[in-house]
């Protein structure tokens, strides 16, 4: 996502990348892991809004309006983008004090304690996010405790807790991504 410092932070794309606001070759692809996770959430009956901040060119001020009325933000982060992502999440929490922030990706999976030390991050997902996020959001919506849910890390009473990994997922159980969740204004690369 964008931040106060730069329009685009980092995003892998086909044969290139976005880096600090500059496109370096290639064509963009949809955020497939977020799309897959959003699809699982939608099929579980949750209200889902998927925004590709880079492809939709949503700036920081617009982003504040997007998160004003939502309960949870889920962000895919990497080590390269982690500092800006976590700072952005902290700023967004200032506009929505009840906002819960969840991050997943390689950085939170391999460095869970380090990730949770940042005040902008409430919960991390370790390894594959689809079913862990589904179970987590279901527990949150039901007002139930998620402390024992495998595959997450979280903060409670100023302490960091990292639970065991969620069992490996049979990828045949993950549904085909619902591309209707993507903005119809997006123009993703299609090699076919």
Region spans (language model):
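Short, P/G- and charge-enriched loop/turn segments at secondary-structure junctions
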Residues: 23-25, 149, 191
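Short glycine-rich His-centered loop
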Residues: 1-26
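Radical SAM [4Fe-4S] cluster-binding motif and immediate context
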Residues: 29, 172-192
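Generic beta-structure capping elements
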Residues: 15, 165-166, 177-179
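A residue-identity detector for tryptophan
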Residues: 18, 154, 171, 188-189
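Glycine-rich beta-alpha loop elements in corrinoid/cobalamin-binding modules
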Residues: 33, 37-167, 171
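Short catalytic helix/loop segments, enriched in acidic residues and glycine
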Residues: 19-41
């Amino acid at each position: 996502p964008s931040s106060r410092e730069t329009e685009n932070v980092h995003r892998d794309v086909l044969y290139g990348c976005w880096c600090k606001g500059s496109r370096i070759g290639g064509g963009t692809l949809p955020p497939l892991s977020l799309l897959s996770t959003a699809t699982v959430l939608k099929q579980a009956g949750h209200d889902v809004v998927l925004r590709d901040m880079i492809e939709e060119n949503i700036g920081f001020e617009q982003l504040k309006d997007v998160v004003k009325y939502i309960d949870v933000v889920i962000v895919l982060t990497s080590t390269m983008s982690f500092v800006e992502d976590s700072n952005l999440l902290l700023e967004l929490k200032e506009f929505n004090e009840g906002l819960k922030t969840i991050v997943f990706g390689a950085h939170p999976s391999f460095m869970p304690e380090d990730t949770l030390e940042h005040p902008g991050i409430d919960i991390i997902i370790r390894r594959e996010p689809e079913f862990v996020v589904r179970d987590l959001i279901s527990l949150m919506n039901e007002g139930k405790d998620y402390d024992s849910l495998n595959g997450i890390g979280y903060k409670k009473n100023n302490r960091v807790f990292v639970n065991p990994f969620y069992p490996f997922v049979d990828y045949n159980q993950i549904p085909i991504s619902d591309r209707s969740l993507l903005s119809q204004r997006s123009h993703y690369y299609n090699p076919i």
